[in-house]
């Protein structure tokens, strides 16, 4: 019986693909070596310990229907589109070794005619006339008895969009999380015009088989039916939830300030696990009572645009004469935390 397993996803849903990855990783026998090939439609994928409000322009992502997905490995934020080919290598310990999977990807690139090399902690680069250019970034996860190495290859990604979503507006965030490392990148199509996702997957698959001296049939994972993986439904529900993607952010503080016709407002939030643990309001408004009441209502509130709006608009019952001010405040807060 082969010790290899090859899975290929035909879904572009990041939450689906990351849930598949998690389920395979949890239930695989320690003697198995797994290759999972996949790709995502427009998504910002952040590391396990990252703060999406710091790493991403969440407002623009919402406007452009770009999803946020938190992975279970560490590392920085990256933008995925269908121009990225994603790979995951898994193995039990002591065999798990990220240098093995790195060499498999390098061999695959070499077979395609691209000479690349490992650089730094998790990148693959090619040499160009303008200097080294990154074509792949990776992250890793290990448990007591197994590990995985996953990453992306930039095939024909829309690099102009990276700055749209990974360079957020300057917010006054004092974060305790991890700030992403920005790198100079290039697409494989700059080196191999016309190269396709299918060709890259085939090269990685053949390099995988060659390394282990075995072959195995590919298993196609499709969203058309629930994958036959233990606890997949529960894992997908968690992976796609606000509580996981946003609520797992490290503790941080956020200062919002704006001047309205009726006065200036400063809001200071301390946020932990997606909930406001402290809210302070400062204003030169001639009627500060609604804002003072708002600070109390926001304590313990989810740090989510719709919840902030809900708490703000609830004050209309007690302060109907300030309806205009409260609605302006509500709209501003919702836009500021997206």
Swiss-Prot record:
Q: Name one GO molecular function term.
A: ATP binding
Which EC number applies? Answer: 6.3.1.20
The record places domain BPL/LPL catalytic at 29-216
Which Pfam family, an example, fits this chain? Lip_prot_lig_C
Which species does the entry assign this protein to?
Answer: Escherichia coli O7:K1 (strain IAI39 / ExPEC)
Q: Which reaction does it catalyse?
A: L-lysyl-[lipoyl-carrier protein] + (R)-lipoate + ATP = N(6)-[(R)-lipoyl]-L-lysyl-[lipoyl-carrier protein] + AMP + diphosphate + H(+)
Family per record: Belongs to the LplA family.
* Residues that bind ATP: 71, 76-79, 134
Oligomeric state and partners? Monomer.
Q: Which residues bind (R)-lipoate?
A: 134
Q: Which Gene3D superfamilies match?
A: Bira Bifunctional Protein, Domain 2 (3.30.930.10), CO dehydrogenase flavoprotein, C-terminal domain (3.30.390.50)
Pathway listed: Protein modification; protein lipoylation via exogenous pathway; protein N(6)-(lipoyl)lysine from lipoate: step 1/2; Protein modification; protein lipoylation via exogenous pathway; protein N(6)-(lipoyl)lysine from lipoate: step 2/2
GO aspect biological process, one term? protein modification process
Name one cellular component (GO) term.
cytosol
Q: What else is known?
A: In the transfer reaction, the free carboxyl group of lipoic acid is attached via an amide linkage to the epsilon-amino group of a specific lysine residue of lipoyl domains of lipoate-dependent enzymes.
Instruction: Give the subcellular location.
Output: Cytoplasm
Note the InterPro entries from the entry: aa-tRNA-synth_II/BPL/LPL (IPR045864), BPL_LPL_catalytic (IPR004143), Lipoate_ligase_A (IPR023741), Lipoate_protein_ligase_C (IPR019491), LipoylTrfase_LipoateP_Ligase (IPR004562)
Q: Which UniProt keywords apply?
A: ATP-binding, Cytoplasm, Ligase, Nucleotide-binding
The gene from which this protein is expressed is lplA
Name of the featured protein: Lipoate-protein ligase A
What role does it play? Catalyzes both the ATP-dependent activation of exogenously supplied lipoate to lipoyl-AMP and the transfer of the activated lipoyl onto the lipoyl domains of lipoate-dependent enzymes.
């Amino acid at each position: 019986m082969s010790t290899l397993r090859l899975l290929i996803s035909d879904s572009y849903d990041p939450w689906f693909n990351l849930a598949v990855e998690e389920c395979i990783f949890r239930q695989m026998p320690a003697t198995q070596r797994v290759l999972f090939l996949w790709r995502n439609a427009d998504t910002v994928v952040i590391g396990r310990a990252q703060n999406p409000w710091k790493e991403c322009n969440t407002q623009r992502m919402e406007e452009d229907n770009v999803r946020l997905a938190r992975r279970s490995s560490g590392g920085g934020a990256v933008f995925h589109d269908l121009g990225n080919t994603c790979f995951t290598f898994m193995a039990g310990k002591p065999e798990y070794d990220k240098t093995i999977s790195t060499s498999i990807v390098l061999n695959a690139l070499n077979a395609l005619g691209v000479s690349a090399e490992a650089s730094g902690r998790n990148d693959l680069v090619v040499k160009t006339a303008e200097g080294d250019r990154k074509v792949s970034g990776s992250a890793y996860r290990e448990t007591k008895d197994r590990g995985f190495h996953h990453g992306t290859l930039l095939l024909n990604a829309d690099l102009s969009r990276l700055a749209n979503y990974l360079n957020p507006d300057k917010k006054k965030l004092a974060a305790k999380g991890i700030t992403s490392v920005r790198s100079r990148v290039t697409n494989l199509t700059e080196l191999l015009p016309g190269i396709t996702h299918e060709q890259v997957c085939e090269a990685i698959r053949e390099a995988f088989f060659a390394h282990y001296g075995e072959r195995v049939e590919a298993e196609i994972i499709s969203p058309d039916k629930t994958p036959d993986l233990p606890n997949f439904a529960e894992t997908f529900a968690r992976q796609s939830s606000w509580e996981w993607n946003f609520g797992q952010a490290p503790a941080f503080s956020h200062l919002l300030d704006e001047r309205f016709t009726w006065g200036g407002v400063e809001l200071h939030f301390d946020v932990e696990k997606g909930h406001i643990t402290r809210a302070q309001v400062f204003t030169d408004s001639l009627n500060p009572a609604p804002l003072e009441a708002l600070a109390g209502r926001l304590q313990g509130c989810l740090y989510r645009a719709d919840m902030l709006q809900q708490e703000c608009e609830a004050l209309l019952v007690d302060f109907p004469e300030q309806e205009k001010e409260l609605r302006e405040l509500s709209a501003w807060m919702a836009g500021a935390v997206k």
